[in-house]
Amino acid sequence: MSISNSEDKKKIILNAAADIVKEEGVAKLTLEAVAKKAGLSKGGLLYHYSSKEALIIGMVQDWTYRYFKSIETIVENNTKSGVGNWTSAYIKASFSDLNLDKRLSSALLVAMFTNPSLLEEYKKEYDILLGKLMNDGVDPINVTIIRLAIDGMWFSEIFGLGSLDTNLKNNFINKLNNMIKEHSC
């Protein structure tokens, strides 16, 4: 099996696992269910992930990497002044790919309910990002409000609580972006 074909299969498996968690809940995440949803035999799934824990580790690692990499990419591609770049990228990444966010949230939920120690990598990456946000030239209080608002929005999206219509969500995002400009250090 070629590397790209192997990587494609892994993506299919991870997407299937995330879909099961999102649609049916953590308790329904079994190797059999993932294999079926991914269109593979259980042996085919086991070739890539030798156990349910290996699959969960793969989910957390893959989606954590993708999420934080998307933030870094936005910062790298930003041609404006350095003030607020990390905070702006955090806002943009958090709302630009809701499909990625849903998959990351599925991975984090599975880890939280099956083996919370698997969240350590995510926590480390989040702490690194938090350091960058707090040293971004934006008032630390505004950064904290922005971060907690995004985390709250993410929580709301994960659990389907108080969904915002498109207009309100866009106004919310605009308000967060305006807070970057307010009281810059």
Label the predicted regions.
Residues 12, 20-54:
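Helix-turn-helix
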Residues 1-7, 185:
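N-terminal intrinsically disordered/low-complexity leader segments
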Residues 90-94, 105-109, 146-153:
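Short alpha-helical scaffolding segments that buttress acidic/His motifs in well-ordered protein cores
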Residues 118-123, 127, 132-185:
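Hydrophobic/aromatic-rich alpha-helical bundle segments in the mid-to-C-terminal region
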